[in-house]
Amino acid sequence: MTNTRKTHPLIKIINHSFIDLPAPSNISAWWNFGSLLGLCLIIQILTGLFLAMHYTSDTMTAFSSVTHICRDVNYGWLIRYMHANGASMFFICLFLHVGRGLYYGSYTYFETWNIGVILLFTVMATAFMGYVLPWGQMSFWGATVITNLLSAIPYIGTTLVEWIWGGFSVDKATLTRFFAFHFILPFVIAALVMVHLLFLHETGSNNPSGLNSDSDKIPFHPYYTIKDILGVLLLVLTLMILVLFSPDLLGDPDNYTPANPLSTPPHIKPEWYFLFAYAILRSIPNKLGGVLALIFSILILMLFPLLHLSKQRSMMFRPLSQCVFWILVADLLTLTWIGGQPVEHPFIIIGQLASILYFAIILLILPTVSMIENKLLKW
């Protein structure tokens, strides 16, 4: 008797990806975030779909429609806050997933890594456009400030910004197109995730030691399915605690004020997960320079495979690189804090130093330390 699981054209793809997939026997909980990101994406698409059923993308009614969802729709408040805080959980998992990749040298899977960086950009774009939709003060001014950055592009900048706006300011046309893009992009993300997995399954997973694990593989199911379920439980628990006890903890109070083009909020700042990049943007006095630094702060991830000079793949047995890695983490936390502070002394200089350190660690310090460790192996 043939096993349908292994012969059916469609089911066998699922089988090779989630059931009979050979996985290293020693991957730790840091490898759980891939499945958690998949779950986050599903939660976001489902809650987003139900929100879109009641939301109107018109400047006159957008804010009221969100209020209507929270007050009048059955469990609308739950759906709305699951969607808003689900985005935060998504980014927490993303940052940990990327951090894991950096620590254990997963970036040597070149295609998988680069698709991952493109995914990061796409998710950031989606989150930015989603933040504009409730049409509160921070939505409007955030959209104005961030889209305005494109005007720094020489020659075509101003035309480009007005083309994106669909007018001479952020208005009805902007909101409508942002809603359209915010709706379609998660499906683009889902397609990219498939490609990400396709490339990953060409090589198999990395593991904490960074060594080849072909000699010791175990089936994904039941070992890692049960392990993933634990991660899922913890993620859902954290999300629901956030949603049910302090849904506005990570939001901005200014977004409960309807958008008003005539009154600028005292401190315009994005959601917490963009603050590190926002701090880098603000730390450069020149507009174009700031925009380039902002883009390069994420794009620099693509350089990691080229900057890897160590003879070992993982940082597991490289204490010096470990120290530098954790300094980088501390630096990113510092940048996140600075991004939420007003532009005044001493925050300006702290932000500038943290920005310089960020690029210095990645481009200079980590490769140098890797070479020192290579030398130490010979002695």
Curated annotation (Swiss-Prot):
Question: Which amino acids does the record list as binding heme b b562?
Answer: 83, 182
Could you tell me the Gene Ontology terms of the biological process aspect for this record? mitochondrial electron transport, ubiquinol to cytochrome c
Record has Iron as a keyword: yes
Name its co-factor(s).
Answer: heme b
Pfam families assigned: Cytochrom_B_C, Cytochrome_B
Q: Which InterPro entries match?
A: Cyt_b/b6_C, Cyt_b/b6_C_sf, Cyt_b/b6_N, Cytb/b6-like_sf, Cytochrome_b, Cytochrome_b_C_euk/bac, Cytochrome_b_N_euk/bac, Di-haem_cyt_TM
Quote the record's binding site residues for heme b b566. Answer: 97, 196
State one molecular function term (GO).
ubiquinol-cytochrome-c reductase activity
Further comment? Heme 1 (or BL or b562) is low-potential and absorbs at about 562 nm, and heme 2 (or BH or b566) is high-potential and absorbs at about 566 nm.
Question: Into which family does the record put it?
Answer: Belongs to the cytochrome b family.
Q: What is this protein called?
A: Cytochrome b
Q: Which organism is it from?
A: Spermophilus pygmaeus (Little ground squirrel)
Q: Which gene encodes it?
A: MT-CYB
